[in-house]
Amino acid sequence: MEKSSIYGLTWTNLTEWLEAHGQKKFRATQVWDWLYRKRVKTFEEMSNVPKETIELLTANFVMNTLEEQVVQESTDGTTKYLFKLSDGNLIETVMMKQEYGLSVCVTTQVGCNIGCTFCASGLLKKSRDLTAGEIVEQIMNVQHYLDGRNLEERVSHVVVMGIGEPFDNYDNVMDFLRVINHDKGLAIGARHITVSTSGLAPRIIDFANEDFQVNLAISLHAPNNELRTSIMRINKTYSIEKLMEAIHYYVNKTNRRITFEYIMLKGVNDHKKEALELAALLGEHRHLAYVNLIPYNPVDEHIDYERSTKEDVLAFYDTLKKNGINCVIRREHGTDIDAACGQLRSKQIKRVGVRERMKQKQAAAEE
């Protein structure tokens, strides 16, 4: 039997599992204290947990399914991690130092099928969803990295914006949120957590009905169907009209602000025309709409795209502001490392592929 990650169990899951296996309910409190407060790396270190319980946990669960492969540190404090999963797949995680604390961007899938033409993540198609445990472990590995350097710093914010579409892995992402938000877990405040979606309208409605105060971000990137479909394949399934219907439901249900992410592509979506269209699109909910203008990180494989000029970004920003839309230009992180989402993973897979082809050629030559 393949063991699963202990980090994938919510508080309710762990409590019920322990009781079903003849253990006292309060053991869950002890185990979570060791996992998330003391942050031990083995079950054997849980000194106040009975040997019987330790043996039971060891027989059924593991604590470390991610293996650190590459760590890139930027001069601005951003750190990018490449992890290998137990099946050999690679994923990325990013830690960013902000004025308000330490923020970690997590991956939710191995690859991505959404098909955004400007994104490095979509170059390698989705092979599987991550488990809740694999998502939680990204946070824990970053925290262990900090602990190991005797840095008295704690992950305080989480953005679910890494490789993959979070709402295409909905159940595992929800369990992940329940673990990191729980007061006996990592206790990261709901309002310090943001989940981003490319626009899976039915899941936005589901998310509105969850008992969470977690922030929602929409990867919009275009204000009309023709343009959005040309750069985001998901728009063929969920048009802007369907997306806005779901957003209308979310806003009315939660009365919470939504962030709209808008990547600035030179000559594609950065004209005054698009800025005015965007302002009109968000007008009904302008009091709860917040636009995040994102400078494009060029990706080698996407030679058709360039980042908008600073002048065009500022002009776009000014047009939105003049039309009553709250917006900000995102501060860039890790510009001196593989900053674009999916870029480090893509490069590593290429390197491995080249090495394997060289080995095959060498073996063939020796035969």
From Swiss-Prot:
It comes from Listeria monocytogenes serovar 1/2a (strain ATCC BAA-679 / EGD-e). Specifically methylates position 2 of adenine 2503 in 23S rRNA and position 2 of adenine 37 in tRNAs. The active site is at E92 (proton acceptor), C341 (s-methylcysteine intermediate). NCBIfam families: rRNA_mod_RlmN. Its EC number is 2.1.1.192. HAMAP family: RNA_methyltr_RlmN. [4Fe-4S] cluster binds at C112, C116, C119. Reaction proceeds by a ping-pong mechanism involving intermediate methylation of a conserved cysteine residue. It is an enzyme of class 2 (transferase). Residues 98-326 form the Radical SAM core domain. This is Probable dual-specificity RNA methyltransferase RlmN.
